[in-house]
Structures are given as C-alpha cells and as structure tokens.
C-alpha cells in the first residue's frame, strides 16, 4: 500500500482507515486493544481517557508518541479518588511515562502542569504553544530541541534555529 492504514479511537468511535467501525465513547483501553489487534491496521492513534486508565490501565506497553494538550479545568474530577487537577495530571502523566526511549512526548509548554511532565518521559520532548517566545519553548529550542507554534497562517516546526513552515 501507498501508506499506513491507521486505526483510531476517540470519544466518538473507532475508525480503521477512515471508516467508522464502532460508535460511542471508545476512548478506553478495550477499544484501543481492538485496534491493535485489527488485521488491517499498521499504525494506531488513541484518545486515552482518564477513566479507562484508572479502571484498566493502558492498552499498550510503550508508545512512539504521546500528546498531552491540557489537563482540563476540573470537569473530570471525582472519579477514582481524583479530586484535584494535580491528581488528574498524575493519571495523564502515565501516558508520557510509557513513551518508548526512542519516542517523543508532545507537551503544551503553556500549561505548567503539562510542561512539567517532560521530566517523566524516557524519550525526547517536543513542546508546543501559541506564543513562539514562550519561556519553556525558548529554553528548549536554545538547547537544540524541538518546538511547534503557530505563526499567522502557518504552523512552524522548529529544532534549534532551523524552522519549517506548514501553511494552514
């Protein structure tokens, strides 16, 4: 085939190669395992909900990429002894802790709780933020590391001083 056939789970369903094969909230480990075992899937993308992590753990031992966009503003509190945003961050950090050493965690530099998860990642870190000059990202880039930000009508992927623009 020309490219990878992607399996994906999220709160709307399960998809294989852009075809929905299940509907409903499929952001838990059972749906993720079904994608991992699907014979037509070459690569997988999972929305990983905190409830599933608390009830059943992760559906995988290691991942190549983990993305944490935010922790939320408390709308997911009250399940499984999760009573503060910091408690919720501990749960979401589990995904970052399971990045393969050759993998990458993509973390929101503008959210201090998310940015701090970098210390738990066995792989590399890519930070993102709206502000290209965010201090966390600026320090990271100055060390020759990767960062992503929006610049007008483009997304910019940078590593150190090198930048690649992707028009929106």
Residues of each region from the PLM?
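Alpha-helix C-cap/termination motif
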Residues: 2, 38-39, 98, 120
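Acidic, Mg2+-coordinating active-site environments of NTP-dependent enzymes
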Residues: 55-168
């Amino acid at each position: 085939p020309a490219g990878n056939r992607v399996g994906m789970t999220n709160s709307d369903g399960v998809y294989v190669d852009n075809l929905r094969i299940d509907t409903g909230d499929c952001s838990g480990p059972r749906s993720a395992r079904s994608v991992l075992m699907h014979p037509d899937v070459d690569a997988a993308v999972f929305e990983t909900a905190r409830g599933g992590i608390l009830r059943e753990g992760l559906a995988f031992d290691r991942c190549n990429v983990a993305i944490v966009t935010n922790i939320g503003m408390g709308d997911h509190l009250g399940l499984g002894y999760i009573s503060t945003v910091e408690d919720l961050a501990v749960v979401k950090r589990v995904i970052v802790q399971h990045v393969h050493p050759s993998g990458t965690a993509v973390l929101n530099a503008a959210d201090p709780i998310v940015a701090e998860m970098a210390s738990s990642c066995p792989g590399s870190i890519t930070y993102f933020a709206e502000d290209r000059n965010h201090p966390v990202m600026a320090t990271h880039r100055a060390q020759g590391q990767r960062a992503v930000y929006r610049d007008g009508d483009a997304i910019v992927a940078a590593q150190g001083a090198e930048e690649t623009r992707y028009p929106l």
